[in-house]
Amino acid sequence: MIEIEIRDINNNIVGKKEVPDIVFNNSASESVVHTAVVAYMANQRQGTHCTKTRSEVSGGGKKPWRQKHTGRARHGSIRSPLWRKGGIVFGPKPRDYYIQLPKQMKDTALFKALTMKYRDNEILLLDNLSLNRIKTKDMVEILKNLQLEESSVLIALPEKDEKVLLSARNIPYIGVVRAEDLNAYHVAMFDKVVFTVAGLDKLLSIKGVS
């Protein structure tokens, strides 16, 4: 078990929490994080890109000039890839980029990414994060108290919190996710990861870690 400090929004230590080694002291290879991030990014692609080959470009059915005795190079179509506005050779066509990973590999990648953050002192555990109103200024003040104003920060909450979400929405370097939606890509994209105690408990519960 690993013991991690619990802080309040004023950056005061208010307690400690024991977390299983698998979460913040995972021994898996770092390559699993790379695999998970590549898969996540590939799965975001629409794959709707499309170019036309010489047979699909409109026009070009007529031979532009006769084969011989013109002094010019021989051509059979103005839609040859050699011509301006001609077809594309080996261009992209619509395809599915989806990469399916086993659930266990995704979980391992997430825990390994969290382990890497923890070893770099980039994990913060808060007792609670709640706002009385929707106010960006209030969220900025909390980040300053936690000395996070110069870092990109991912906040993992147990449930969707409109006040936190809307207060953080206008801050370009802040991300807010539900703990159950957290993945290795999210963790890798931000400098710091902030959990609430309830958010971390929710993550452990969903992943079956005790």
Curated annotation (Swiss-Prot):
Q: Spans of biased composition, class Basic residues?
A: 63-76
Which residues, if any, are the signal sequence?
A: none
The family database entries (InterPro entries) matched by this protein are listed as: Ribosomal_uL4, Ribosomal_uL4-like, Ribosomal_uL4_dom_sf
Alphabetized Pfam families for the sequence:
Ribosomal_L4
Top-level taxon in the UniProt lineage:
Bacteria
Q: Which GO terms describe its biological process?
A: translation
Residue ranges the record marks as coiled coil: none
UniProt GO MF annotations:
rRNA binding; structural constituent of ribosome
Q: Which GO terms describe its cellular component?
A: ribonucleoprotein complex; ribosome
Q: Where is this region: Disordered?
A: 49-76
The keyword Ribonucleoprotein is annotated on this UniProt entry: yes
Which keywords has UniProt assigned to this entry? Ribonucleoprotein, Ribosomal protein, RNA-binding, rRNA-binding
Relate the protein's function as given in its record. One of the primary rRNA binding proteins, this protein initially binds near the 5'-end of the 23S rRNA. It is important during the early stages of 50S assembly. It makes multiple contacts with different domains of the 23S rRNA in the assembled 50S subunit and ribosome.
Q: Which NCBIfam families match?
A: rplD_bact
Q: How does it assemble?
A: Part of the 50S ribosomal subunit.
UniProt lists the family membership as follows:
Belongs to the universal ribosomal protein uL4 family.
Name listed for the protein in its UniProt record: Large ribosomal subunit protein uL4
Say which species the protein is native to.
Thermodesulfovibrio yellowstonii (strain ATCC 51303 / DSM 11347 / YP87)
